[in-house]
Design a protein with these regions (language model features):
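N-terminal transmembrane alpha-helices
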Residues: 19-51, 55-56, 72-84, 88, ...
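Helix-terminus/linker motif at the lipid-water interface of multi-pass membrane proteins
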Residues: 40, 44-62, 131-140, 196-203, ...
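Residue-level hotspots within pore-lining transmembrane alpha-helices
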Residues: 37, 41, 45, 74-78, ...
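Transmembrane helical elements of multi-pass membrane transporters/channels
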Residues: 29-49, 152, 186, 215-219, ...
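Small-residue-rich hydrophobic transmembrane alpha-helices
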Residues: 61-121, 160-179, 286-352, 383-405
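Interfacial/gating helices of multi-pass transporter permease domains
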Residues: 53-72, 104, 140-145, 205-206, ...
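Short alpha-helical transmembrane segments in multi-pass integral membrane proteins
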Residues: 1-32, 89-156, 200-257, 314-379, ...
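Short runs within selected transmembrane alpha-helices of multi-pass transporters and secretion channels
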Residues: 82, 152-171, 179-190, 208-223, ...
């Protein structure tokens, strides 16, 4: 009974969390539950979105699998800006410098808007087709469907940029409930509009992208209202870009650019694996991997929610020069991840067909996807370790360690392993390239975390002395 009361006390959501002095485990649980719920709901949305599209036919499902690298690229840029801002803004709040925290957030917003220009080529079929042909797509209908979906990225990216930075601002202040409610509004409306736009209006794959745009716009209205009432840091929706922001853009990029490259390396690695699967086993293997990734994401993305909660906690206490509290935070993050991500991973591993059948795949695709899911989840303990310590790298400004680890995993191990295994194993067992790459990343993470902890221990002998603080 006492144990249950303790669990209930730790999981009770009370608005803002006390990042600097609250009990570490309960503070991180309070931050993590809304973050995990947010990514679960977001993953569920993408799952349902993909299910609706798969009902349009196999060519549409293959087209969506080719758009994954683009979607990852979009969020790679946002993760770079968001993580760079979160690390700097959280550090300034930990130092008690609210004005500099506000300036950092404002600069991050302007930077994110400026980066929206990168996605303009996806408005045009010619440039879109060039991109997708490099990923191995050749069928004219697949290329057309991929363009119809991705042409919505440039206008939607403006809305996503605003929401991403604002949600990061709330997390820096210990508030993860408002980002959760934003996603409930945006993705809830998206789920309602998806079948209407896709089937009732007959817009097909374009309807899925249009529903995303409308849902995001509704969520933005909610965020603008909450900024006025629940945040000490105010951000305008209207673009605010000045040359005086350049120094802050440099600091954000120093932390965020390695994060962007890290996530982009995942996109490049996925595109390379798509090529290997398509060339060796045909489009059926690509479709099966897409289905497997969507189902597996139900478990894996909870880890991203815990990471999102851990970065502001670590950066705030890094600003306070409290290494002991940071170590306790990472240990607590490992415990929470083992329970939530590990538990969900086990459920998905045991019962994959319950979710796979939503896609109405052929019997062969369902069997291949189930094998891919089960083999991949075998490597989850190593993934949990790597992701938790990557949050540590980002929060302290050493995101380059995470970049090197991710490139090592995605490009130097996963792609060669997939190529080698495709020559000696059948389509049912090629998926062992995933756990192999996870093991390599965990070993690299262990080395970098040992180096960084030794450095911080030397630099932070006095945890309460802000004079030791540095920008990296």
């Amino acid at each position: 009974m006492k144990f249950m009361k303790a669990v209930m006390r730790m999981t009770r959501l009370r608005g803002k969390a006390d990042l600097g002095s609250g009990p570490v485990l309960s503070t991180l649980i309070q931050l993590s539950i809304p973050s995990v719920a947010m990514v679960l709901f977001h993953t569920l949305f993408h799952l349902v979105d993909t299910v609706f599209i798969s009902w349009l036919g196999e060519s549409h499902m293959v087209a969506i699998s080719y758009t994954f690298p683009v979607q990852i690229g979009v969020f790679a840029i946002l993760e770079g800006v968001g993580n760079g801002m979160t690390a700097l803004c959280g550090r300034r709040l930990g130092e008690g410098n609210l004005e500099e925290a506000r300036n950092t957030a404002l600069a991050a917003m302007g930077f994110a808007y400026l980066l929206c220009l990168i996605w303009i080529p996806f408005l045009f079929p010619y440039t879109s087709n060039i991109f997708f042909r490099t990923l191995g797509a050749s069928d004219p209908e697949t290329l057309r469907q991929a363009w119809l979906y991705n042409m919505w990225i440039p206008p939607t990216f403006i809305l996503i940029s605003f929401s991403y930075v604002v949600n990061s601002v709330f997390r820096c202040q210990g508030n993860t409930m408002i980002p959760l409610k934003y996603f409930l509004i945006a993705n809830g409306l998206n789920l309602v509009l998806d079948p209407i736009f896709i089937f009732t209006f007959g817009w097909g794959i374009t309807g899925a992208a249009a529903a995303t745009f409308v849902g995001r716009a509704a969520g933005i209205v909610y965020l603008i209202k909450k900024l006025k009432t629940d945040s000490e840091i105010q951000l305008p929706f209207k673009p605010y870009i000045k040359l005086s922001m350049l120094p802050l853009w440099g600091k954000i990029s120093a932390i965020g650019f390695p994060v962007t490259l890290s996530t982009a390396s995942v996109a490049l690695g996925m595109g390379s694996v798509n090529n290997i699967l398509s060339g060796t086993f045909g489009p059926q293997a690509v479709a099966a991997w897409m289905v497997g990734l969507r189902v597996e994401d139900l478990a894996f993305n909870t880890l991203m929610g815990i990471n999102d909660a851990l970065v502001p906690f670590l950066s705030f206490n890094y600003g306070r020069r409290d290494l002991r509290r940071m170590k306790n935070g990472m240990r607590s993050g490992l415990i929470i991840s083992a329970v939530i991500t590990g538990g969900l991973g086990l459920v998905v591993c045991l019962f994959p067909f319950s979710v796979i059948q939503l896609f109405r795949p052929s019997e062969d695709i369902a069997r291949i996807a189930a094998n891919a899911i089960r083999i991949t989840i075998a490597g989850y303990p190593m993934v949990i370790y790597s992701v938790i310590y990557n949050a540590f790298f980002v929060a302290t400004g050493f995101s380059t360690f995470g970049l090197i680890t991710q490139i090592f995993r995605s490009l130097m191990i996963r792609v060669p392993a997939a190529h080698f295994l495709s020559r000696i194993l059948t389509i049912d067992y090629i998926w062992w390239f995933q756990p192999i790459s996870f093991l390599g990343a965990a070993l690299m993470t262990g080395l970098f975390s040992w180096i960084l902890l030794r450095k911080l221990k030397r630099d932070m002998d006095d945890p309460k002395d802000p004079a030791c603080a540095k920008d990296f």
